[in-house]
């Protein structure tokens, strides 16, 4: 699936996400993601974040969550696992998601804020979890050659417990990955560059072997970078989703990394 969304977040804690269109064009990656009306699997989505940090999604494109039953529930895990406070019955795009009637009802009439306010929010943020790659630096396109990962055992993302509120800066890669794993990691691991060491100290296994559901991490760039591993293909290439990679804070994109490149990243399990 292909996706892209852009966030603007206000000091009050509300956010309005606007669809960002166009093709992704990293010089080092040559990706071509985003909504493509000619691709039957392509879509984009918007979402709002309320004062409690809850996400509310709206879909556009050739795929939407009403197809979950056709996909054997895969996307039910992908997008809804860990988000327990939503209502998908009354989206303003007209879709009906009666299967999610158990979720709480929220309105989508949050006030819109401009991009400058979003930058101001991040600059003066009270959150202390740490940052990810800065959209204004070359760390958006990190290329790792080799990294020796620390290793520790005892805890895991798959069997871990929720650590609490997301303390990472909204719009950053660290914020997205914390939510993507359902909060089953530390909320104060600092900048993305510190995550491998912090995870090992906390008892998680950290190595250079990619696996679906793991966190991909690198120390390169001003703050490092983290992404969520969606899948590992038969040829060893790794599909990841991430925030603030090339499009700025709040933008969720996905890409495929070759097996040779993936071998140079750390993976937290």
From Swiss-Prot:
Pfam families in UniProt: CHAP
Name of the featured protein: Staphylococcal secretory antigen ssaA2
Region described as 7 X 3 AA repeats of Y-[NS]-N: 83-115
UniProt KW keywords: Repeat, Secreted, Signal, Virulence
Peptidase C51 domain span: 148-269
Organism: Staphylococcus aureus (strain MSSA476)
Domain of life where this protein originates: Bacteria
Positions of Sequence repeats: 83-85, 88-90, 91-93, 97-99, 103-105, 106-108, 115-117
InterPro entries membership: CHAP_dom, Papain-like_cys_pep_sf
GO cellular component: a single term: extracellular region
Originating gene: ssaA2
Signal peptide residues on this chain, from the entry's feature table: 1-27
Role, per record: Not known; immunogenic protein.
Cellular localization per UniProt: Secreted
């Amino acid at each position: 699936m292909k996706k892209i969304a852009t966030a603007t977040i206000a000091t009050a804690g509300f956010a309005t996400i606007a669809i960002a269109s166009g093709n992704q064009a990293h010089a080092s990656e040559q990706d071509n993601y985003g909504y493509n009306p000619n691709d039957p699997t392509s879509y984009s989505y918007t979402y709002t974040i309320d004062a409690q940090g809850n996400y509310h999604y709206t879909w556009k494109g050739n795929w939407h969550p009403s197809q979950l039953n056709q996909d054997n529930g895969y996307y039910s895990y992908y997008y809804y696992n860990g988000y327990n406070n939503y209502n998908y019955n009354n989206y303003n795009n007209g879709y009906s998601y009666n299967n999610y009637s158990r979720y709480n009802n929220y309105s989508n009439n949050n006030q819109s804020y401009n991009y400058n306010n979003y930058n101001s929010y991040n600059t003066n943020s009270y959150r202390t979890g740490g940052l990810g790659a800065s959209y204004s630096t070359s760390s958006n396109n990190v290329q790792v050659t080799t990294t020796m990962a620390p290793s520790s055992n005892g805890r895991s993302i798959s069997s871990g417990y929720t650590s609490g509120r997301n303390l990472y800066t909204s719009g950053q890669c660290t914020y997205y990955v914390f939510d993507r794993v359902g909060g089953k990691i530390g909320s104060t691991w600092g900048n993305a560059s510190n995550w491998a060491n912090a995870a090992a100290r906390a008892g998680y296994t950290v190595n250079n072997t990619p696996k679906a559901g793991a966190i991909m991490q690198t120390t390169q760039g001003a703050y490092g970078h983290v992404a969520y591993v969606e899948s590992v293909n038969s040829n060893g290439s790794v599909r990841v989703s991430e925030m603030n990679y090339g499009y700025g804070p709040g933008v969720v994109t996905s890409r495929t990394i070759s097996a040779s490149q993936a071998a140079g990243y750390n993976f937290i399990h």
